[in-house]
Amino acid sequence: MFTGIFKKNINSKTNTVVSTLSLLRNHNLIDKNKRYKIIVNKRIPVFAGLGGGTGNAATIIKYFLKKKLSPKLLDIFENKIGSDLRLFFFNHSFQENLKKIKGFRKKYKFYFLLVYPNIKSSTKEVYSNVKRFNSPLKIDPSKINSKKEYNKFLINEANDLQKIVEKKHKKIKTILNLIRFQKNCLFSRMTGSGSVCYGAFQNRVSANLAMKVIKKKFPDYWCVLTKSI
């Protein structure tokens, strides 16, 4: 059962909650004869690139399996649900490739301004237009020891899918430029295959001021402030 402002965009018969329960039953991990009532307060947009559906799946898996999720089972769930599922089982980490997650040595606090421009971006369509991906990382982020070095690493990173989406939806670039030029914004980028645009800030005050600018310019867009954990 879905509640919340974005519940109308969810298909009640085909979603990650239904898929996850089905997988758990098929692998005899939960009782096939029992039915469960799961309520999801859908407060983030669909087709936003924020991993909301995958996060729901990970939460259900953690609840039923506790700490008994083997690497083999994780591979099975990941193949059916999404390649980003693995990330939800690690804290303060990055995905080096589809199968490898690494953790950072230190935690650094950032504030993120998220803007959803009411664009439903199809992951399948975006990936079908990829000609090539950037070269692998030249440095190992897990060995970063300072905030300055960490900031530099993030700023120099890029989303290979961003230009593809910008080409189709011009306002993505407009929003990202507006965010980037706000005071104390480290960088602005698009999430995954889109379409949420975000900016990273080092303090809440600057992020709040930027949010006011964005809300004034785009009053109909979903716009929220969050922070790293």
Across the structure, where does each feature detected by a protein language model lie?
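ATP-binding N-lobe of GHMP and related small-molecule kinases
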Residues: M1-A48, L65-K72, Y108, Y116-I119
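Conserved, helical-rich catalytic subdomain that frames metal- and/or nucleotide-binding sites
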Residues: S12-N15, F88-F187, Q202-K215, P219-D220, ...
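Phosphate-handling active-site elements
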Residues: N28-K37, Y63-I81, N203-I214
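DPxDG-like acidic metal-binding loop motif
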Residues: A48-D75, L87
